[in-house]
Amino acid sequence: MGFFITFEGIEASGKTTQINLLYDYLKSIGKNVIKTREPGGTKIGQKIREILLSKWDEKFPYIAELLLYESDRNIHIQSIVKPSLDAGYIVLSDRYIDSTTAYQHYARGIDYEIVSYLNTLATDGLKPNLTFLIDIPVEISLKRLSESKDRIESEDIEFHKKLREGFLKIAENEKGRFVVIDGTMDIMEIHKIIVDSLKQRSII
């Protein structure tokens, strides 16, 4: 069985940069590793991602949004994550179930039990072995975002504040799985903390 590592954070937190750095490092020391993302880790998922992030001139109900995320996740788990773990790979995923809990429950206000049930259904109960939360203040997140924001990035500041609070609550409730890192630090300093965390857990 492999090892499943997820990276979480609000928009423009720097998690994708850290996944890329860790992926390159693990490859350099001879580890079997893949990197993937949600939404959009599969060909079908890329189409779902386009729908989710595009701006529409018609109502996009929150439940419809949630179901699309979970559809993407189910395909992703069955096609990429589980087969890779079964083959003994380290799997690095840019977002996973904690993003859905933060975005759809804490920020959108959908009932926690609904979100939790659908997360479990889509993943067959598969949880990450380890999750890195790259935490940055909302003001820095919004400053880092480009002018051409997608549908989610374009939400108001209150949405992003609820999102950050949600991620921190999730991490507080599952301290054994989470490593919370100050995302305002130097990129390579963050990378070192991540690598050291893996060494401390005898993953590498």
From Swiss-Prot:
CDD domains: TMPK (cd01672). The keyword Kinase applies. PROSITE patterns: THYMIDYLATE_KINASE. It catalyses: dTMP + ATP = dTDP + ADP. One of its GO terms (cellular component) is cytosol. Its EC number is 2.7.4.9. GO terms for biological process: dTDP biosynthetic process; dTTP biosynthetic process; dUDP biosynthetic process. Keywords: ATP-binding, Kinase, Nucleotide biosynthesis, Nucleotide-binding, Transferase. ATP binds at residues 9-16. It is an enzyme of class 2 (transferase). GO terms for molecular function: ATP binding; dTMP kinase activity. Phosphorylation of dTMP to form dTDP in both de novo and salvage pathways of dTTP synthesis. Belongs to the thymidylate kinase family. PANTHER family: THYMIDYLATE KINASE, UMP-CMP KINASE 2, MITOCHONDRIAL. This is Thymidylate kinase. The lineage of its organism: Bacteria, Pseudomonadati, Aquificota, Aquificia, Aquificales.
